[in-house]
């Protein structure tokens, strides 16, 4: 499974490498607020790209359908399918899952439906909204495709829809945004978190304020003064009960933060200080960076509540797909060195991806 996946990912990235060129990435017309990844391409030029996107989607969908039954969550979904969706046993299961189970005569067809929707929405979001299509594919294939589309398939559909919907925050189109978030919520309830985020800053971010918040979160995380520790001193029963549900007790042992957590936080600060230049070429930069910052804050502030840290960090972390891709836009002069930095950030996650594929990840 690992060899097949790496071969497929390498083939996709080699064939799409021309999309990383300066000519393609800087094709957006700065005078237009509405962003199009291939804005200056004529219809005849776009068609082969979209055909290629379709072929990429087909290959990835096949990987999802015929994945190993040793992957995390595979047995759970197979058991739920046999129980008709598990609607009588799990009250938290979404109605969409029960509906798709009823529409699927076999478990493989269920996997095919979910894969088509999740991979399709991700590819559509990338080719529509990404500041650098090739780099977004690198981020997606190096980690999030395996984590979400191949394992957490319900949340994958919701996040794919949100990747497309983010453009409506900048365009100030509340109805299509809320409609898409509502559809995403039908596939996974955690998408409700994105409803109020329509009102996040969309024009600019104060680099000093947000850098200060990130640095404070770094200090709290590395000194074991994160949310779980602070919650000990809040005399509110429901907070105590909520934290206990994740920890099981009030003896907090922080998950060890590695150098990667600090590195990702400093990437956010770098993007903040270069946001003005990035926005010139990528109008969606502010909400994308906001989601990326939220992700990093979750990783740092919930370090002593590993379940929340992973769930929320990975949820908002999906926007790494765009955040890492906009990193090279900080400087046209140093575009290619910065692109290498983005690639190296992705390579840090490849060992985890291999473990997920092998079914050995903890």
Positions of the model-derived regions?
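Transmembrane-helix signature of polytopic, membrane-embedded enzymes
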Residues: 126-143
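Alpha-helical transmembrane segments and terminal signal-anchor/GPI-anchor hydrophobic tails
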Residues: 34, 51, 70, 75-79, ...
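Signature aromatic-anchored transmembrane alpha helix within multi-pass, membrane-resident enzymes
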Residues: 215, 332-351
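Transmembrane-embedded, aromatic-rich helix segments that form part
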Residues: 178-180, 190-201, 212
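Transmembrane-helix motifs of polytopic, lipid-linked glycan transferases
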Residues: 113-129
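Short acidic/glycine- and proline-prone juxtamembrane loop motifs at membrane-interface regions
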Residues: 150-156
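TM-lumen/periplasm interface segments of multi-pass membrane proteins
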Residues: 20-115, 352-362
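Membrane-interface transmembrane helices that cradle and orient dolichyl/undecaprenyl
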Residues: 162-176
């Amino acid at each position: 499974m690992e060899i097949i996946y790496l071969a497929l990912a390498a083939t996709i990235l080699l064939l799409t490498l021309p999309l990383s060129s300066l000519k393609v990435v800087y094709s957006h017309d700065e005078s237009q607020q509405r962003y199009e990844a291939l804005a200056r391409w004529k219809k005849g030029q776009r068609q082969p790209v979209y055909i290629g996107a379709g072929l990429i989607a087909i290959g990835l969908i096949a990987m999802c359908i015929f994945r190993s039954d040793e992957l995390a969550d595979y047995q759970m979904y197979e058991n739920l399918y046999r129980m008709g969706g598990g609607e009588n046993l799990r009250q938290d299961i979404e109605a969409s899952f029960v509906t798709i189970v009823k529409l699927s005569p076999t478990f493989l067809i269920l996997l095919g439906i979910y894969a088509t929707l999740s991979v399709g929405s991700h590819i559509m979001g990338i080719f529509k909204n990404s500041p650098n299509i090739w780099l977004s594919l690198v981020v997606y294939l190096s980690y999030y495709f395996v984590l979400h589309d191949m394992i957490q398939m319900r949340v994958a559909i919701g996040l794919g829809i949100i990747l497309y919907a983010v453009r409506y925050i900048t365009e100030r189109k509340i109805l299509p945004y809320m409609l898409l978030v509502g559809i995403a919520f039908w596939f996974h309830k955690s998408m409700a978190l994105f409803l109020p985020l329509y009102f996040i800053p969309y024009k600019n971010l104060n680099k000093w304020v947000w850098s200060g918040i990130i640095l404070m979160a770094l200090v709290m995380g590395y000194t074991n003064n994160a949310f779980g520790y602070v919650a000990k001193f809040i005399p509110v029963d429901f907070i105590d009960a909520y934290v206990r549900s994740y920890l099981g007790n009030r003896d907090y042992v922080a998950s060890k933060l590695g150098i990667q957590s600090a590195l990702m936080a400093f990437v956010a600060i770098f993007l903040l200080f270069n946001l003005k230049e990035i926005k010139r070429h990528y109008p969606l930069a502010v909400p994308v960076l906001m989601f990326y910052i939220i992700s990093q804050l979750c990783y740092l502030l919930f370090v002593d509540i590993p379940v929340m840290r992973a769930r929320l960090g990975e949820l908002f972390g999906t926007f790494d797909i765009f955040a890492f891709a906009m990193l090279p836009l900080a400087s046209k002069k140093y575009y290619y060195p910065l692109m290498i930095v983005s690639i190296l950030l992705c390579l840090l996650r490849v060992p985890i991806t291999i473990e997920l594929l092998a079914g050995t990840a903890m």
